[in-house]
Regions:
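ATP/Mg2+ or Mg2+-diphosphate-binding catalytic cores
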Residues: 6-7, 13, 122-156
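Short, surface-exposed acidic
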Residues: 11-15, 98-110
Length: 156
């Protein structure tokens, strides 16, 4: 993403700061098991149907899916809350998860890194998808600033 930013002839000081945080917490991050995660879980991207009286769910629009730390799924769920306050999301996830989220110090660090990662995605994405005259540009400006601030607050 930092290379994408450079190709747009821009520089991301907050992205570089995030990379330094990743280096600082690499021992914590290396312990995370990987699985398919989705940074774009919100109601328009979820399809539900009933089969034999049971609700089945499907995700659509997976352009922000990747193989990585499962804690990233929580970034967009109840997104303005810190991990420990995402009671509904944690309860639903933990009810079906093989490995529940316990909101440990390490999980909070991993969550903060993922918030910063989404901030970096939004920061860089605006250079390729929008101009300053588009609503999306300004949404990404403010949203990425919020994600970075929250991330760096959790990575002190």
């Amino acid at each position: 993403l930092l290379d994408d930013c450079a190709r747009a002839k821009k520089k991301s000081k907050r992205g570089e700061k995030l990379l330094a945080c990743i280096d600082r917490y690499q021992d914590v991050l290396k312990k995370a098991e990987c699985c398919m995660v989705n940074f774009d879980i919100w109601w328009p991207n979820i399809i539900c149907n009933r089969e034999n009286g049971e609700i089945k769910y499907a995700w659509i629009d997976p352009e922000r899916s990747f193989w990585g730390d499962r804690i990233a799924d929580f970034v967009c769920l109840e997104y303005q809350k810190p991990l420990e306050k995402k009671k509904a999301s944690l309860a639903a996830y933990n009810a079906v998860a093989d490995e529940p989220i316990r909101v440990t110090r390490e999980e909070k660090i991993r969550y903060a890194v993922m918030q910063g990662y989404l901030g970096l995605i939004q920061e860089v994405e605006k250079y390729y998808r929008y101009t300053p005259k588009h609503f999306g540009w300004w949404r990404n400006v403010f949203s990425s600033a919020w994600f970075y601030k929250s991330a760096f607050g959790g990575l002190k």
